[in-house]
Each structure stands twice: as structure tokens, then as C-alpha cells.
Amino acid sequence: MKYRIFKMKYTLLFLSVIALVHIFAVEAKDEPESDALVPQERGCLDIGKTCKDDCECCGCGNVCYCPFDWFGGKWQPFGCSCAYGLKYVCAHKQKKCPNV
């Protein structure tokens, strides 16, 4: 008898957790996606986001870093991403980029 009550309690607890997870999943789907900003709509990209130019990265000292930037050009087989730059980057970006 005790085993049956014990089993029933844990079954109800498990079903309650499943129902709670389902409710949060449904609420997440119902939120409008129009409020979400697309990276192109924002003025700049955060650290770690894929970029093509220094001007796309947020902040005065952040740069578009290409770890495998071979031959000095912007040919990057593995892509570039926004990263923290050095102090002189800020002066360079202010000359180059209108949005800094």
C-alpha cells in the first residue's frame, strides 16, 4: 500500500513538471518576433558575432578579428568575429567609421 502511494506521488510530481515545462514552451512561442532586432537593423554587432569589417563591431576599441586572415586580405576561410582590440584601434575606427 505504501509503495502505491509513493509511486503515485512521484507520478504526479513528474506530470506537474512536464506540464510546467510545456506552459513555458508555449508562452515562448507566443511572443512576437517583431521586437527582436536583426543584426543588420542594429548599428553594430556584439563581441563574438560574425563580421566583415571593423565598423560593424560595437564600441570604439572592438575590431573585426580574422584568426586565419591569410595573405593580408579579407579572405577568411573560417570567418571573422568581433573581438576586443588594442588602444590604438579607437583612433583608427574614429577616422574610418562614421558610426563610432
Curated annotation (Swiss-Prot):
Residue runs in coiled coils: none
Tissue and organ distribution: Expressed by the venom gland.
Residue positions assigned to the propeptide: 29-41
An example molecular function term from Gene Ontology annotations: toxin activity
Cysteines paired by S-S bonds: 44-58, 51-64, 57-82, 66-80, 90-97
Location in the cell: Secreted
Primary site of residence: secreted
Residues in the signal sequence: 1-28
Domain of life: Eukaryota
Any one GO cellular component localisation term in the record: extracellular region
Alphabetical keyword list: Disulfide bond, Knottin, Neurotoxin, Secreted, Signal, Toxin
Domain notes: The presence of a 'disulfide through disulfide knot' structurally defines this protein as a knottin.
Function: Probable neurotoxin.
Family: Belongs to the neurotoxin 09 (Tx3-6) family.
UniProt-recorded name of the protein: U12-ctenitoxin-Pn1a
The species this protein was found in: Phoneutria nigriventer
Highest classification ranks of the organism: Eukaryota, Metazoa, Ecdysozoa, Arthropoda, Chelicerata
